[in-house]
Regions:
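Outer membrane beta-barrel
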Residues: 1-69, 80-99, 129, 139, ...
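Sequence/structural signature of outer-membrane beta-barrel proteins
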Residues: 12-29, 56-80, 105-115, 143-154, ...
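Hydrophobic, well-ordered secondary-structure elements that form the walls
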Residues: 180, 224, 258, 269-270, ...
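C-terminal structured domain segments
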Residues: 251-274
């Protein structure tokens, strides 16, 4: 298009947090975003600035439910095709050390339950990073929301979520990289993705038991990767979530894995993943521990 604008029409997955390196490479999700949408996207880069604007439909939505003691009761039953979806993202990188940006998502209900109810969702994010040197970077993101009263279901309709990350490369420590992360999410925050779960499709997460109330969930996470040579890589992760809710135990998850790069196009990976939700959680929430062993073959074309 004119003025060097990149324009896209169709279906795509948008992930601004991933673009800025705001979650660990083996993790599946950002706090918010990273979902399919159908529509129009325009992107413009000029100098050290980048801007993206989106108009779309059919974006992912979440239907909050509350536990009535016997079953989960949906708040509204809204669907993804009941919302118009508008997004604006701007970021600025003046030099190799510092970057800053902001994102806004506006979900406006215009059909069905989303139109008939007060169910709009406005989500705003501010993110930044500072590299002390090429191997150490401090970065993070802060979200705040305004959600419709009907969708909030009687709980806080202006929730917050944020995380801070210290990213240390293996070039500094020699034997491993380190990803140290602290995250805090209000329990009424709308649209939280599963946090710190492995990037392999359907997976369990320490935030799966997050309740809907006016408290906040705190998540600590440590990730480490060891690149031994061109063939062998190992990694490990530990994450723990405190839901700040009486009767709900903390969730703890740890993972170890090894990857063998057989050829430039073929890799084999073996992973052990363990999660413990505690033993005394209320009916309707996960309890006990579980684990899996996963063998994965990746072929690149």
């Amino acid at each position: 298009l004119p003025y060097d604008i990149d324009f896209r029409v169709g279906r795509w997955l948008q992930d601004f947090e991933g673009d800025m390196g705001l979650y660990w490479g083996y993790d599946a999700n950002p706090i918010f975003g990273s979902y399919r949408m159908d529509g129009f996207r325009a992107h413009k880069a000029w100098g050290n600035f980048n801007g993206t604007a989106i108009v779309a439909r059919n974006s992912k939505t979440w239907d909050y439910s509350t536990w009535d003691g016997a079953k989960w009761v949906p708040a509204l039953g809204t669907d993804s095709d009941e919302y118009m979806h508008y997004v604006l993202d701007m970021n600025f990188r003046p030099n190799e050390k510092f970057w800053v940006g902001a994102t806004a998502y506006w979900w406006q209900g215009d059909f069905g339950a989303a139109d008939a109810s007060d169910a709009n969702v406005n989500t705003y994010g501010i993110y930044a990073g500072f590299a002390f040197n090429p191997n150490v970077e401090l970065k993070g993101i802060y979200y705040f929301q305004n959600i419709g009263n009907d969708l909030a279901n009687g709980f806080d309709d202006s929730p917050k979520a944020w995380k801070a990350v210290l990213d240390v490369k293996q070039d500094l420590l020699k034997f491993t990289s380190l990803w140290l992360q602290y995250e805090q999410v209000d329990n009424s925050f709308y649209g939280l993705n599963q946090q710190n779960n492995m990037d392999w499709g359907q997976a369990i997460s320490v935030t799966d038991n997050r309740p809907m109330n006016d408290n906040s969930t705190k998540v600590w996470m440590l990730g480490a990767e060891q690149v031994w040579n061109d063939k062998w890589t190992t990694f490990l992760k530990y994450a723990q979530a405190d839901y700040d809710t009486a009767g709900l135990d903390d969730a703890k998850n740890w993972t170890v894995g090894v990857t063998y790069q057989y050829t430039p196009a073929v890799a084999f990976q073996l992973v052990y993943d363990n999660i413990d939700f505690g033993d005394n959680n209320p009916l309707g929430f996960s309890s006990g521990d579980d684990h899996l062993i996963k063998f994965r073959t990746s072929v690149s074309f």
